[in-house]
Amino acid sequence: MSDQQQQQPGQDGQPFFNIQRVYLKDLSLEQPNSPHIFLEQEQPTVEVQVDVAATQLAEGVFEVTVIGTVTTKVKEKVAFLVEAKQAGIFDIRNVPVEQMDPLLGIACPTIVYPYLRSNIADTIGRAGFQPIHLAEINFQALYEQRLASAMEEAQAAGGNGGIVMPDGSKATH
């Protein structure tokens, strides 16, 4: 056996990224018009909303949550409403500050989202409805859209504003 201490990942100064855990944080299903809604013959309308949130839990440890809401209506009556939060805990160390936000807003949600899709489809199917398989999401395009929108809002609010990165510098795009 060696007397050398074994270094923990990320302690050598090299960028380190690890998925600690992916888990279902919250799931709810509402069927306010069951069982009568099952007798309707009309095609339902489906509305899907997806959002992303990130929280720092400890130094180098982050939780990224992808929130999905699916509302299905038949003749303006809600057939079902599913709300789910799928989360992941990630170890992220020695990553340059300017890369953290895209990592948390693009890479992590891309890892978590397939689990959310599966859980929502499974829940809808188990509720007695045809499963709805959510489309793939380009989280980079979504991130860039939100960044542009936030910059527009900041400029409209103060004229000289902008997004401030974690290191205090202003975002350049």
Swiss-Prot record:
GO cellular component labels: cytoplasm
Domain of life: Bacteria
Signal peptide extent: none
InterPro entries cross-referenced by the UniProt entry: SecB (IPR003708), SecB-like_sf (IPR035958)
Subcellular location: Cytoplasm
GO molecular function terms listed in the Swiss-Prot or TrEMBL record: unfolded protein binding
Keyword Phosphoprotein among UniProt keywords: no
Task performed by this protein: One of the proteins required for the normal export of preproteins out of the cell cytoplasm. It is a molecular chaperone that binds to a subset of precursor proteins, maintaining them in a translocation-competent state. It also specifically binds to its receptor SecA.
Protein name per Swiss-Prot or TrEMBL: Protein-export protein SecB
Protein's organism: Ralstonia nicotianae (strain ATCC BAA-1114 / GMI1000)
Gene (name only): secB
